Design a protein with these regions (language model features):
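Alpha/beta-hydrolase fold catalytic core
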Residues: 1-31, 47, 54-55, 226-231
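Hydrophobic alpha-helical segments, principally membrane-spanning helices and signal/leader peptides
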Residues: 17, 22-23, 105, 111, ...
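Serine-dependent carboxylesterase/thioesterase catalytic core
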Residues: 28-29, 33-44, 48, 52-66, ...
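C-terminal catalytic-base region of ester-bond hydrolases, centering on the histidine
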Residues: 166-231
Length: 231
């Protein structure tokens, strides 16, 4: 007859609380991280990164959009409403933004519509802040169907190159050194920011532990830790 599991083994087997359960259990305001995915992706792509940030004590709130044909501005309007909702939530003390790819451009446009009073730091992973050379190649074929493709070209007249950047916000950018969609140079915004490049592909950033470590460090300090060249 097998021994009954003791308290330690029962605790180990207990599932981790959900973000909403932790919100109700914790006294005091949370540091909330709003996660926004990129083009042709979904919130599940952010699950690993969100889990790693949850374990560091943040309350992650993935925000997604399904219609990839809509303009970035349509998604930005919807995301600005989410920011306003979080801003009014008494359980939320700070609203950090962590985005991947086009999600960063949606967040930039949303902040032009609504800037939360509780706005914290802004980390962008592989953002096409100056446009994407892949969008340049695809715009003739896909631009008429998928509006974001035309809005993300490197043209000086494209939407992405006409958007502003939020002022007085700590901005950190993590680029992918082997990115076939967005060059490291194109990830840089035209405002003061911290920047680091990891040797990986565009979407791999979301699954790397070192990328999550960098995100968490920037959210905590407003800086990326020094890294040994090549690592």
């Amino acid at each position: 007859m097998k021994p009954r599991p003791g308290p330690a083994s029962q605790a180990a087997a207990a599932p981790e609380p959900t973000p909403d359960e932790r919100t109700s259990a914790k006294a005091g305001p949370w540091e909330c991280v709003s996660l926004v995915h990129g083009f042709l992706a979904n919130s599940w792509m952010l699950a690993m990164l969100g889990h790693r940030l949850d374990r560091r004590g943040y309350l992650t709130k993935p925000w997604g959009y399904s219609n990839m044909r809509c303009s970035i501005l349509v998604h930005a309007e919807a995301f600005s409403l989410e920011l306003a909702r979080l801003d009014a939530d008494r359980a939320v003390g700070t609203i950090h933004l962590v985005t991947h790819s086009m999600g960063g451009i949606i967040a930039r446009a949303a902040l032009e519509r609504y800037r939360p009073q509780k706005l914290g730091r802004f980390v962008m992973l592989a953002p096409p802040n100056r446009g994407s050379f892949m969008a340049n190649a695809a715009v003739r074929v896909l631009g008429g169907v998928f509006k974001p493709v035309a809005e993300l070209t490197t043209s000086s007249e494209s939407l992405v190159n006409s958007l502003g950047m939020p002022a007085d916000v700590d901005i950190g950018v993590i680029a992918a050194g082997r990115d076939a969609l967005v060059s490291a140079a194109s990830t840089r915004p035209d405002v003061p920011h911290a920047h680091v490049t990891l040797p990986c592909l565009h979407s791999s950033l979301l699954f790397r532990r070192d990328a999550a470590d960098l995100v968490a460090a920037f959210l905590a300090t407003g800086e990326f830790p020094d890294r040994t060249p090549g690592h």
